[in-house]
């Protein structure tokens, strides 16, 4: 695996990567993300209601903007695209992960105000992402 990698598993994927039971991952996602980020020497974005972002240096961030709409199919791919786009603009990996998770969750919150959390499609996020990014640039 290349050195410059951001992993973005949800608990089920993290279970397959680590061979830990899903309930163990969900019971302490902060410590699990921190441990495996250090072990693998990779940035880990452990997606769940409160997404945990961990770096190999031990820094850990928690996104407290929980949105059940992000549990729908394809939203993780949108997150990967946001993070990848930031990395392509030379944003450092950890910063790209933290910022990407924030942009993703804020976009979902904004969209779900109009369509609700149960009707959100991953593609609904696409028009809101540049709006959130522009607000960040201007703040």
Report the location of each language-model feature.
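Glycine-rich phosphate/dinucleotide-binding loop and adjoining beta-alpha-beta core of small-molecule
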Residues: 1-65, 138
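Short, small-residue alpha-helix embedded
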Residues: 16, 72-103
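Short beta-alpha connecting loops at secondary-structure transitions
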Residues: 17-18, 64-70, 80, 84, ...
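Short capping/connector residues at structural and topological boundaries
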Residues: 19-22, 65-68, 75, 116, ...
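Short, charged, surface-exposed loops that flank catalytic or proteolytic processing sites
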Residues: 23-28, 90-95, 116-120
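Short, well-structured alpha-helical segments that form the helix of a local strand-helix-strand
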Residues: 29-37, 93-107, 122-130
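Charged C-terminal helix
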Residues: 108-139
């Amino acid at each position: 695996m290349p050195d410059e990698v951001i992993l973005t598993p949800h608990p089920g994927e993290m279970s397959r990567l680590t061979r830990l039971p899903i309930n163990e991952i969900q019971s302490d996602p902060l410590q699990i993300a921190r441990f495996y980020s250090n072990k693998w020497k990779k940035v880990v974005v452990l997606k769940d209601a409160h997404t945990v972002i961990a770096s190999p240096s031990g820094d850990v961030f928690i996104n407290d903007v929980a949105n059940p709409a992000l549990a729908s199919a394809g939203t993780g791919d949108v997150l990967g695209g946001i993070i990848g786009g930031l990395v392509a603009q030379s944003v450092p990996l950890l910063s790209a992960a933290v910022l990407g998770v924030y942009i993703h969750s804020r976009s979902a919150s904004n969209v779900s105000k109009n369509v609700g959390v149960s009707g959100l499609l991953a593609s609904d996020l696409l028009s809101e992402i540049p709006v959130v990014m522009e607000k960040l640039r201007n703040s």
